[in-house]
Amino acid sequence: MKKNIHTMICITLCQFYFSCNLNVEPLIVGYWNVENLFDLIDDPEKNDDEFSIGGRKNVTEDIYKLKLTHTAEVLADLNADVVGLSEVENEFVIKDLIDNYSNRKYDYIHYDSPDERGIDNVLLYDQNKIDIISDRPISNNLPGGDKTRDVLYVQGKYRDEIIHIFVCHWPSRYGGVEKTAPKRAITAQLIVKEISSILSEDADAEIILLGDFNEEPNGINIESLKTIGLKSLMEPMIGKPKVGTYVYRGKDELVDQIIIHESLQDQNGLIIDPESLYILDLPKYRQQEGRYAHYPFRFWAGDQVLGGYSDHLAIRVAIIKK
């Protein structure tokens, strides 16, 4: 009897060890559109006047500090090891955020893009969790000289596995969804070209896209990514009541997405934990009353400071080594 008990304990401990080992230190990957994180200085090369001292919004140093404080609060709640950000003006605000406000010491990757509003994509990452191999901006050239943000590409290594990360902020729907869809189609084609090149060298490459796609998972341009084995993790959430990362004219939308290549679901190397997909939808991040109840609690409403966080909610998922 004593031998059987010892055997059972041994088996239980082994099962616990291997179960924990499978899930030890997952890589938490997130994304958030921070909504206009600008510094206070007027850059003559950018359309940032309204966010500068003396500009239309009457921004002060206290308002700037509040924006950074609230941005850091969301990042702390998200607690991602790697997080893509959109709508960040420049390197100055990134350094200010991570050096003086964040409770976690991130490093960052950023390139100035030609976007006419002066907003860029950024990747924050924990050097203790992922090694960066290479990074570069991918120019997103739209017809008619329309200036938009680059796609940020980063190649990293996690637990001896290569992972390809794309941080995206697809062209806006301003002017109408249908009218602006061709711009997003060009960006989708750019993504297809870049990823096809990666897959031509490694058919099992582990690829993840993080971004505000200004289109839902069942949108025509997101659907086009399926031709190269990409799939939005947000797809199962479509149509669920009160579920979304953004609200447009009272309708919840899933424009902020994590999109993966099928290789991250093949049970080899790195895999996505589907149960870990999470929208950071805490009560404090939504307006609780009034005409815009349930809308994300944004920082700006036109030229008025609401003092919230962003008009988008953050998202995250866990990646584990199989």
Segment roles from a protein language model:
Residues 32-34, 71-94, 124, 165, ...:
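Active-site beta-strand/loop signature of hydrolases that rely on acidic residues for catalysis
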Residues 18-105, 113-119, 189, 285-293, ...:
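N-terminal, active-site-proximal structural segment of metallo-dependent hydrolase catalytic domains
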Residues 56-62, 79-85, 110-111, 141, ...:
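Second-shell loop/turn segments in exported
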Residues 90-92, 116-118, 173-175, 214-220, ...:
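Active-site environment of divalent metal-dependent phosphoester hydrolases
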Residues 196-207, 215-322:
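Metal-dependent phosphoester-hydrolase catalytic domains
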Residues 82, 88-164, 168-171:
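Structured beta-strand-rich core segments of catalytic domains in phosphoester-bond hydrolases
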Residues 158-189, 193:
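Metal-dependent phosphoester/phosphodiester hydrolase catalytic core
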Residues 1-25:
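Bacterial Sec-dependent N-terminal signal peptides
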